[in-house]
Amino acid sequence: MSKFKEIMGWLWPIILGLLIALVIKTYFFSLVRVDGTSMYPNLQNNELVALFKQGKIKRGTVIVFDAYGVDANAQPKDKYVKRVIGLPGDKIEYKNDGKLYVNGVRQSQSYITKKQQVAGTLTLQANEAKGITLGSGQIFTVPKDKYFVLGDNRAASNDSRYYGFVPTNKILGTVKTGFWNDKAQVINHFVPAK
């Protein structure tokens, strides 16, 4: 019996530690690797970022979502990293000079250059807003329980312009970067200026 107690004496802390780690990874926090350049220059290809599963989503928040079923080209287990531009119920308008308006209020896009703000397609391909041309003065509304997301590298990003709005139930959490990332401020704490 004392041999059993001895084994359990060192085995129990290991089991407890693994259980705590599993709970943390499942419900609170995990690491995700950025795949591709759609968030350049703020996130780099292969950069490791923290995913907070209980993070609050607001305009400007960078999120990770399960792309399977959102993007027709996504495979099971594909995860996309994008920036939230529109929340459920928001009215989105792009002016022809790349200025972004949400609910009639101009939004800061200081996290990317003026050239990046107007790069990529300006005609929405998504079914919910198909044919709306950004920059033409047309306004569209983000549906209930969905988000409009864009990559920071607008010219190379496969985002809501192509596959539509991201359902709330597909969002895995919010992204945070380490202090060593010189763009950490625009990922961790960006708040669109009014």
Model-derived regions: residue spans:
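Hydrophobic membrane-insertion alpha-helices, especially the h-region
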Residues: 9-27
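Soluble "head" domains of membrane/secretory-pathway proteins
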Residues: 3, 7-8, 12, 45-194
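Alpha-helical transmembrane signal-anchor/signal-peptide segments
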Residues: 30-45
